[in-house]
Amino acid sequence: MKNIATSLILTFVLVLNAYAIDVTITDFGAKTDADNNTEAIQKAFDHCSANGGGTVHVPTGTFNVSTIVLKDRVHLRLHAGAVLKAIPNPDLYRPRSVIAGINIKNASITGEGTIDGQGDHSNFQFGDGKGNRPHVVLLRECSDILIKDVSLVNSASWTVNLDRCDGVQVRGIKILSHGNHNCDGIDINSRNVVISDCIIDCDDDALCFKSEKEGYLVEHVTVTNCIIASNCNAIKFGTASLCGFRNIAISNCVIRKASESNIRKWKGQLRGISTDTTVLSGIALEVVDGGFMDRVVISNISMEDVQTPIFIRLGNRKGAGTLKNVILSGITARNESMMTSSITGIPGHYVENVTLRDILFDCTGGGEEKDASILVPEKENAYPENRMFGPVLPAYGFYVRHVKNLTFENVQCVLQSPDARPAFLFEDVHNLWLNNFQATTPTGQAPIVRLIGSSDVVVSGFRTQQTVPSLVKVEEGCKNIDIRLNDSGKIQKVQ
């Protein structure tokens, strides 16, 4: 019986292989000196599709194209030195992408070649959020898709758009896009996605999870072993958050500034930024459209040249949703602004159940005494961004407001230059455990930790080699504050 089953499987595989054909685009009329090879290449795809599937090979050379539509069971293979180059005519892209897959199964884009979106061409320069600018790759409502090893460069819009797909693997690709506005790296509004071993260098958000459709949940996604560079946010959830994000893990990634910055010039615009090229937020978790976030784990992340290492925001742009059950661990960062890492909800709607563990931040410093007393506006319905509260926050390490059930474990904030702000400011925070932590002593009389309107707080295990004038300042509206087991030998005033 076992031999019969094995024979049937082998027969099935042989039948499939018999129908899987290999074709080269030049066999269908594609030429390197042609103005437009779209029709010829599409014929190659259609031929494979009509014969049960196969592989379309792109040989060495540059081929001008507009939209190429992928087919079921047909694989695109770009050989070394092969380039599919977008024709700079916005009217030619239907759907709005150089490579498009709509409701297809079992297809791939692989090889050592390149797809060039020509996003820096003057014909695509419409401005931020405007114009019919094509993606490099658009996959909509597809399943069982592989994108591997290819280089995707110079997109006119988002480079890779994964829209409501189920079962996508993105492995070992390189993205370089700095020629236009909105040049995201990979946008994920899909399920069951694996992204690994990629190098992403782009002008807008590098990895962006978007929940763009009510009732469609973005879930079961893993990202690992990537190098991420951006002039905007490196790892972002939102801004679109209509339904939700659930069961997502990101690990073992390096975040750095982009290789170039042709649009954003940050130096001198905001205090504490000394270079034109920086990442806005290393990690930005945003729910502002009435959706939810649940069970997101981010670990082993090293970042440098980021304005704000961590930005977590529950807002009310189109409705107040929920943001809970988040773990961030093993994160190191050197920041490049006075816009502190923050975790903020809004009055009556709390960020809940967040753990930060094994965190080391090298903070810019430079805060003055007046900065420590800044009143931070709520801005409940504002666009979520690290600078939404202003260029300076009243703490140099973390500013936290409207949060319940928060754990900080083994968190270190080290100053690059003197700062008169406290390291941590917690306002309207309930059930907080701040344990086994370190921070550079602020100048003047600022405490390490400032508590406002907070309750059920445990501050323990503070360690220091410096003299600390004040460890914790407990202000109006606080109750059940437990300060214990700290390095009291260097602390002049505990509370």
What label would you give each PLM region?
Residues M1-A5:
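Positively charged n-region of N-terminal signal peptides that target proteins for export
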Residues Y19-Q495:
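Extracellular/periplasmic carbohydrate-active domains that bind, remodel
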Residues S7-N17:
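Bacterial N-terminal signal peptides
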